Every structure is written in C-alpha cells, then in structure tokens.
Design a protein with these regions (language model features):
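C-terminal region of N-terminal signal peptides and the immediate post-cleavage residues
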Residues: 38, 43-50
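Periplasmic/extracellular, small/polar-rich flexible segments of pilin-like filament-forming proteins
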Residues: 69-164
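N-terminal leader/signal peptides at the extreme start of proteins
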Residues: 1-16
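Alpha-helical hydrophobic helix detector
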Residues: 24-39
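Membrane-proximal N-terminal amphipathic helix
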Residues: 48-75
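Structural signature of extracellular appendage/secretion-system components
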Residues: 30, 42-43, 54, 72
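Short, intrinsically disordered N-terminal pre-domain segments
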Residues: 3-4, 40, 162-164
C-alpha cells in the first residue's frame, strides 16, 4: 500500500475581506435605501419649516397682544412707544408697527438666530414679512404682519405654508 503524500502547503496566506461582487451588492443596497429615505427626509424638512412659520405667527400674535396690554397698563397713548424687556417697541393704534422697531422687537425675532429673512413695507399700514430660509418658494412660506389702520383694531397675521 502506497502512502499518499498531502499536497504541499501554500506559502501564500489566505486572502481576507470582501470580494468585488459582495462590495458591489452592498453599494447597490445602500443606494436603494438612500433613494427611498431621501424623499421622506425632504418632507420632514418641509414640515419643520411649516411648523416654524406657524410658531412664529403665534409668537407675533402673542407679542402684539402683550404690547397692547403693556401700553394700557402703563397708561400710554395708543401711538406712544412702550418698553418691553428693556427694548423700545414703536406702536400705532395701540399695537406694534409692522417694521423692525415694532413687531420684530416685540416678538424678539432675529434673522440670524431664527434663520429667516425679514422685509418691510412702508404704510399705512406698515407690513412686516418673515420668510423661512430654505423653503422651496419663499413667497408661499412666510408670515406677514399688517399693522392696524384703525385704533383698537387688531393687526392681521397671515401664515402661508404651501411652499415650505
């Protein structure tokens, strides 16, 4: 009986890691997952901008009411400025004006901190517009404050979120 000799051992170590096919399959799977997740992530950003616009509108309404209450409590004239938390707020018809010295100060809105753009239209009535940066259409993702033209008539606050 003859003995069989085992095949010689290779001096080359066994290769480790992924094969090219495995790597391509993983990349394809990650690409499919990214394609599915991206629209959902974009939708979340749009919802967040719309929620931010609604929150700013609520803040503006509350600030206008608070400014009027402050003026009434202090016995100020309807067109006199009031001081709120150390800042002077210009008033017209017992409510903040629609400019940088009125409702923007009263609501403590900052273009830098709130990631918005601010624009104003001279009146009467004065109008302040707050647009959400990053919106697909700025004209339809904004809050507009229109100061009152008539004494003791509240200002109007309009919210547009269609283009957020």
């Amino acid at each position: 009986m003859q003995r069989r000799t085992p095949p010689p051992l290779s001096s080359r170590p066994a290769a480790g890691g992924f094969t090219l096919i495995e790597l391509i399959v993983v990349i394809v799977i990650l690409g499919v997952l990214a394609a599915v997740a991206l629209p959902r992530f974009t939708s979340l950003q749009s919802d967040a901008r719309a929620a931010k616009a609604n929150a700013l509108a609520g803040s503006i309404r509350a600030a206008a009411t608070l400014a009027k209450s402050t003026a009434l409590v202090r016995g100020s004239a309807c067109n006199a400025s009031v001081t709120m938390e150390g800042s002077t707020v210009t008033m017209i018809n017992c409510y903040p004006t629609g400019d940088a010295l009125g409702i923007i100060v009263a609501a403590n809105i900052s273009a830098t901190n709130d990631n918005v753009t601010l624009s104003y239209a001279a009146g009467p009535p004065t109008v302040a517009t707050v647009e959400m940066i990053g919106a697909t259409t700025l004209a339809t993702c904004r809050v507009t404050y229109t100061a009152s033209n008539v004494a003791d008539t509240p200002p109007t606050v309009a919210v547009l979120t269609g283009g957020c």
